[in-house]
Every structure is written in C-alpha cells, then in structure tokens.
Amino acid sequence: MAKSCLDYRSDRLAKAKQKASIYGYKGAMFPWESDDTGEEATPTWALTGIMEHHVTADVAIAFWNYYTLTQDKIWLKNEFKVLKETADFWVSRVVKNTDGSFSILNVVGADEYAIHVDDNAFTNASAIEALKNAIKAATTLNEPIDPKWKEVSEKLVIHRENGITQNYKGYKGQTIKQADVNLL
C-alpha cells in the first residue's frame, strides 16, 4: 500500500515539475489535490491548491520514510529524483532575509484558517526535513549534494516567542482550524 502511494507521486513527477515552473519555481511542486494525471484538482477559488505547499515536503518525507523502513537502496536510487526535485523546489521557494536567514512567504499551512501567512511553522519545519532527507539520500547514494540544500535547511526560520513555537510569523492567538504546530 505505501509503495503504491509513492508510485502514484513518482509517476506524476513530470506534472509536479510543470506546476513548479508555472509558478516560477524550480524542481517539483506537488498538487494539493491531485487528479489521476497529476494535475491540480483543487477548485481555483480555493487557496489551498495554490498556496498549501507543505504537501510537497510531505511527499518527500514519505519517500525518505519508506527508504528508512525498507533499506531498499535500489528503490532509493530509482526514486532519488523525487527527493532531489522537491529539495530544488524548496531552495527556489525561499527568500533570503537581510540577516542571512530564509523565509517562506505567502502560504497556507495545515491550519487552513491562516491564509497568506509567512513562515508557517509546519510548512517550514517540513521543508527543513525534506531538505535534510534529500541530503541523507544523496549521501547514501553518493550523489551530488546542492550546497543550498544544507544552507536553507540550517537557516530557514521557525518563529518562537518565549520558548513557544508560533504557528506563523505574527501569530497572536488567532482561532485555528488545525493545530499544525502540534504536528512538529
């Protein structure tokens, strides 16, 4: 079952790369709701299809988790392209701040009440994990590692106030739909 879910995403990698390109990004940007061809099936009026980017990291994390459980290096070699392309997406999706850190701007996180937010904690943490997993996979396979993967994974911002992870930059206790920081 798990492999068939991963095969579904891998078989539609070209469409994810096309979606990233349409939005001006590199790599692969997986749809929030994918149809059978890999096209975005979310209605255009729903911002989740356009802005809920953490699904791309979720896909990459699932690929790495499958490898860690199976230790199937042949499978990993064949599917490394998914980890690489999603890492390339995140590197192209971030913006560099004046202090040298990185941010991901204008997203919807798992908390779908919070739209057009910057540095959503779940999105950023998932992107960090996806980048680190791409590095681990590349190391395992002796594949080249883009130095930007490491730089972004180490400097992507997660906002905290008084030791508490904030849902997103500027979060001040607004009502939430899903407590996405609990997913970290």
Protein language model features and the residues they cover:
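Aromatic- and histidine-enriched alpha-helix N-cap/loop-to-helix transition segments
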Residues: 1, 50-61, 78-81, 119-129, ...
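Active-site core of glycosidic bond-cleaving carbohydrate-active enzymes
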Residues: 1-12, 56-61, 65, 132, ...
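Helix-terminus loop motifs that line ligand-binding clefts
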Residues: 2-61, 67-77, 86, 91-101
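Carbohydrate-binding/catalytic loop surfaces
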Residues: 23-49, 101-122, 164-176
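Short linear motifs at secondary-structure transitions and domain/linker junctions
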Residues: 35, 80-83, 160-163
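A structural signal for alpha-helical segments
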Residues: 70-78, 115-118, 122, 144, ...
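Acidic/histidine-rich catalytic neighborhood
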Residues: 85, 89-141
